[in-house]
Design a protein with these regions (language model features):
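Phosphate- and other anionic-substrate recognition elements at nucleic-acid/protein interfaces
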Residues: 1-158
Length: 158
């Protein structure tokens, strides 16, 4: 199963694509979609929407996972991601920041460095993914991979 983790942001949208199979998780790719301060609000939203669509086409994920909209500061960006996933017919799953931290580190109150270090270790990466947004997106993908099973549907956006 391919999972696309997303860390929605207005200036930078982080992404992390992983493959989860038989309890093993491997990184396919990670990175960011960026906007610039010179862009108008509609231009930024269009770039984020188009970037998300491109990621969905490139990695063809089975599921898309990201931080719960309610907790996210920029719900407009998160809604663009949700719209692109919905248009592609993909199930979208959301997790609270505490759930992601608990799943990845074992501590729902872990700090950013603890999260990044565990993402690096769990995914057997040479170094902590940069920028931070990409590491956060990989964290969302890891959280979803850990949640797969009969109970995963409770996290699905309906």
């Amino acid at each position: 199963m391919i999972i696309l983790g997303i860390d929605p942001g207005y200036a930078i949208l982080g992404y992390g694509a992983v493959e989860a199979e038989r309890g093993k998780i491997r990184v396919i790719d990670y990175g960011v979609v960026e906007t610039t301060p010179k862009m108008t609000f509609p231009e930024r939203l269009e770039r984020l929407y188009a970037g998300t669509k491109l990621l969905l086409e490139r990695y063809r994920p089975d599921h898309v996972a990201f931080e719960e909209l309610f907790f996210y500061r920029n719900t407009t960006t998160a809604l663009q991601v949700a719209a692109a996933a919905q248009q592609a017919g993909l199930p979208l799953y959301e997790y609270t920041p505490m759930q992601i931290k608990q799943s990845v580190t074992g501590d729902g109150h872990a700090d950013k460095l603890q999260m990044q270090t565990m993402v690096k270790l769990l995914l057997k990466l040479q170094k902590i993914p940069k920028p931070d947004d990409a590491a956060d997106a990989l964290g969302a993908a890891l959280c979803h991979a850990n949640a797969l099973g009969p109970m995963v549907e409770q996290f699905r956006i309906k």
